[in-house]
Design a protein with these regions (language model features):
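Acidic, surface-exposed loops and disordered segments
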Residues: 1-186
């Protein structure tokens, strides 16, 4: 098996991170991998916001929990009410990925960038977790102000957030993969 396929096989969603920050070299390589993702018509309709400031991460975690509790969504309310719930798994780095709302394929392109981030991280020994739930961060007045303060451009909307950090423990086991989801037309 070649190195790329090995990285794909080993990548897991990590939900326990050590507190130490990833290196600048690792971060630069991971961000570069995002910028190299494919996009429809090479539009590159994305914006990446890298957050490592502990006070900002704490503020985002607090706001996410508050918005989940107010969401009216039974799953989110139950999850946010659980004292063991840690919104970003204590990851020391987050990459917020936003798409140009006018770009028809922006969400797909941002998803490709998120996968590049996760694979690059795994290849460097850095754990990652791609999350869509942080979108709820921006569904309040404080959330709109938060996006502004983070430098998210006007006309861009959250697609996903990638948590990054060193893994606090071994990779989780591979869950069983569905095998009846492929058909070939030859």
């Amino acid at each position: 098996v070649n190195e790329t396929l090995e990285v794909i096989r080993n990548r897991r969603s990590i939900r326990r991170f050590r507190p130490e920050q990833i290196t600048e070299h690792e971060l630069e390589a991971i961000v570069e991998s995002a910028l190299l993702a494919p996009s429809a018509m090479n539009a590159q309709p994305w914006h990446f916001t890298v957050i490592q400031d502990k006070r900002m991460l704490d503020r985002m975690a607090r706001l996410m929990r508050e918005n989940m509790l107010k969401s009216g969504n039974e799953f989110m309310v139950r999850r946010a009410s659980d004292p063991s719930f840690i919104p970003f798994y204590n990851a020391p780095t987050l990459i917020l990925i936003s798409a140009d709302v006018k770009d028809r394929f922006g969400q797909f392109d941002c998803a490709a960038a998120a996968q590049n981030i996760a694979l690059a991280a795994e290849s460097l020994g850095v754990g990652s977790c791609i999350m869509a739930m942080p979108a709820i961060l921006f569904e309040s007045e404080e959330g709109v102000e938060l996006a502004r303060s983070l430098g998210v451009p006007d006309g861009y909307a959250h697609v996903c957030t990638v948590a990054l950090g060193y893994k606090d423990g071994p990779n989780p086991q591979v869950p069983p993969r569905k095998r009846d989801v492929v058909n070939y037309v030859r």
